[in-house]
Amino acid sequence: FSGIEDGTWPAGTAKYEKRGVSAFVPVWNSENCIQCNKCAYVCPHASIRPFVLDEAELAASPYKAGETLEMKVPAAMKGMHFRMQVDVLDCLGCGNCVDVCPGNKNGKALSMSDLESQLGEAPRWDYCAENVKSKQHLVDIKSNVKNSQFATPLFEFSGACSGCGETPYVKLI
């Protein structure tokens, strides 16, 4: 407790809890994703997020061919790679993301699967969270919902009840 003898606590420590309490978590199917970011917008816990990787970040990443998509829009992100990454250990399994996903003509880009089968996604989340730089400076994050989700949330890992309707709004501030 060196340096915090007065009882203060550093901000953002909830990200280290990694409770892994959900029986089911979302699985991203890149082939059906239209990159709308609606899933990230409705997630009460900021545990599903779009990451935009440049060539260097992609080369160093754990992703194989087909596990990211080329950015469609905005134009400032052309040539970069899109990945909707799930933090399976912080997800509470509410299913809001799956419910809101429009998908494409082949179906939704998200489905729920058991946590045990998705534990391999945890190191991928860690890679993105620690190594992929925010690209929010490339877009106007206040112009639309899609762009707003490229901003790093200032309210994350809230610990709110599964499916909480308030935290997505607080996350936008």
Task: For every predicted segment, state its role.
Residues 1-91, 98-171:
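Ferredoxin-type iron-sulfur electron-transfer modules and their immediate structural context
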